[in-house]
Amino acid sequence: MIRIGHGFDVHKFGGEGPVIIGGVAVPYEQGLIAHSDGDVALHALSDALLGAIAAGDIGRHFPDTDDKWKGADSRELLKDVYRRVKEQGYKLGNADVTIIAQAPKMAPYIDAMREAIAHDLETDIRNINVKATTTERLGFTGRKEGIATEAVVLLIKQ
């Protein structure tokens, strides 16, 4: 049996950089405002994994109303989510992550993001795709107000 999950996350720019995205520090003059480290890519990916096993979303498991998660490392949250996936008898087939941002430029960091995600999800890098796009200066991402990310995962019964 296979299961598919979809995740989405958005964070607004603010404060000092860098931007943490895909588990990688990307130099930028601003960071992202969030309760945790604000890693929109890993948040969307975590939501996709939780959705695939019908386990809600990261807000349910790591609420921003709980100081325990303040400044949390999203890579650790992702690992915890993947532990839940494995407990349900599934493993990752593949993941596809789309970062939507006018800035900063993501291309130089994509390979490092793929490596970090593959490591955290205990899979081969060939099972992880990360790509970035702009909105051609349209909308809040085009105005450089924040970053959005979508993620899709395929899980396979072990």
Curated annotation (Swiss-Prot):
A divalent metal cation binds at residues 9, 11, 43. It is an enzyme of class 4 (lyase). It comes from Vibrio vulnificus (strain YJ016). NCBIfam families: ispF. InterPro entries: MECDP_synthase (IPR003526), MECDP_synthase_CS (IPR020555), MECDP_synthase_sf (IPR036571). Pathway: Isoprenoid biosynthesis; isopentenyl diphosphate biosynthesis via DXP pathway; isopentenyl diphosphate from 1-deoxy-D-xylulose 5-phosphate: step 4/6. Gene3D superfamilies: 2-C-methyl-D-erythritol 2,4-cyclodiphosphate synthase. 4-CDP-2-C-methyl-D-erythritol 2-phosphate binds at residues 9-11, 35-36, 57-59, 62-66, 101-107, 133-136, 140, 143. Its cofactor is a divalent metal cation. CDD domains: MECDP_synthase. It catalyses: 4-CDP-2-C-methyl-D-erythritol 2-phosphate = 2-C-methyl-D-erythritol 2,4-cyclic diphosphate + CMP. Involved in the biosynthesis of isopentenyl diphosphate (IPP) and dimethylallyl diphosphate (DMAPP), two major building blocks of isoprenoid compounds. Catalyzes the conversion of 4-diphosphocytidyl-2-C-methyl-D-erythritol 2-phosphate (CDP-ME2P) to 2-C-methyl-D-erythritol 2,4-cyclodiphosphate (ME-CPP) with a corresponding release of cytidine 5-monophosphate (CMP). It comes from the Bacteria. The gene is ispF. The lineage of its organism: Bacteria, Pseudomonadati, Pseudomonadota, Gammaproteobacteria, Vibrionales. HAMAP family: IspF (MF_00107). This is 2-C-methyl-D-erythritol 2,4-cyclodiphosphate synthase. Belongs to the IspF family. Homotrimer. Pfam families: YgbB (PF02542). The keyword rRNA-binding does not apply. One of its GO terms (molecular function) is metal ion binding. The record marks 35, 134 as: Transition state stabilizer. Its EC number is 4.6.1.12.
